[in-house]
Amino acid sequence: MMAARMMAAGLAATALSAHAFRIPTPGEQDARIQTVPYHPEEVVLVRAWNGYVTRIVFDEQEKIIDVAAGFADGWQFSPEGNVLYIKAKSFPAQGSPAQAPEPGLWNTNLLVKTDRRLYDFDLVLASADAATPQALQRSRMAYRLQFRYPAAPQAASRASPVGPAVPAGALNRRYAMQVGNGSDGIAPIAAYDDGRHTWLTFRPGQPFPAVFAVAPDGTETLVNLHIDNQSLVIHRVAPVLMLRSGASVIRIVNQNGDASASPAFECHAEPAL
């Protein structure tokens, strides 16, 4: 098993050298506090250290809903709200003593899904001559990795709420909503798109659900979005969206291609959801 792991580590090292990834920027006060701009199509490098905990801090309005890694047996992942704690751990090799974390062999990929975004990481167990502050600085090991998000749309919306940059008459408001049993608490009060983005508007103080685009085969994919005042602005237009929060579920259907559809946002109960 460990021989196979060593072979996999060699392949992983080749992959790391063959593909580009985003290297976080060290902090001016301390290089172990690192920042990286968020981009949905970039892989971010995370350097950890045996015996130390690294935390990844996402947007304060995000909540982690899924974590997966290629070599999950060699790492401990502890999500708490919008923070993910990471620590290397011994590999429980069958029929032989447990293998302690070893730089190179423990390198893997890490995938994180929140209720707002998808994140991709190369997770590397760094090495140095000694576990001293100077060695940790040289290794660029991260105590904290935090993301910087583009244009802070929440702050901009507080100053002057923005909407679609098209005339109101050009908006598609032909959307229908199917509400599952007991799911009224996550129901939007309006839905529309401008051909590029979709807006779902909620009542003040209403919690935002996770939003998924539904493919023709029924597969659901978490969408990228940002918050504009009381609206979720989805960075795409989809035929069907699913809103989920715990057991609550709502189906939003884009009826723009249906000439018989009402031009106003409609809602009807659908207990089968």
Swiss-Prot record:
The keyword Membrane applies. It holds the Pfam family CagX. Keywords: Cell outer membrane, Membrane, Signal. InterPro entries: Conjugal_tfr_TrbG/VirB9/CagX (IPR010258), VirB9 (IPR014148), VirB9/CagX/TrbG_C (IPR033645), VirB9/CagX/TrbG_C_sf (IPR038161). Residues 1-20 form the signal peptide. It is found in: Cell outer membrane. One of its GO terms (cellular component) is cell outer membrane. CDD domains: VirB9_CagX_TrbG. Its main location: membrane. B.parapertussis strain 10978 harboring a functional ptx-ptl promoter from B.pertussis produces the PtlF protein in a stable form. Is also able, but less efficiently, to produce and secrete the pertussis toxin (PTX). Belongs to the TrbG/VirB9 family. This is Type IV secretion system protein PtlF homolog. It comes from Bordetella parapertussis (strain 12822 / ATCC BAA-587 / NCTC 13253).
